[in-house]
Amino acid sequence: MARPDYYGNPAGLTDEAGVVRAIYDAFARRDLEGALGYVSPDCELDLAGTARLAGRSGPYQGHDGLRDYFRDVERVWEELLLHTEDIRVIPGSVIVIGHITGRRQGLVVSRSSVWTWRVKDGRATSVKVADLGDLAQT
């Protein structure tokens, strides 16, 4: 059964989900410039999985941090795809439930994930990803 358009965003009152969707779409195209337009210049990007693989110890900071993240993805992953399965909006925040699939050094990776975004004035101000472990196989 398909969910109604307003699912997780009652009455479609907020556009935060659109901002986050645009960032995911830009990432899928590896369109850094497209993503930058939706990210605050002082954003904090706590994307620990890729950061750890790239040898970083803290979050990516600001637009330069987003540039570093895109470079790190290209450097440490042969392939990395983000899959959004459900998006929930609470004014000011967007919760994305989904998973990642990737390939690194010939190994296939599938992990359940939850991304918590903060959005203000039409731009993402932060994101934190929670790695929920190996994706259950059905």
Tell me the role of every PLM-derived stretch.
Residues 1-138:
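C-terminal and inter-domain tail/linker signature
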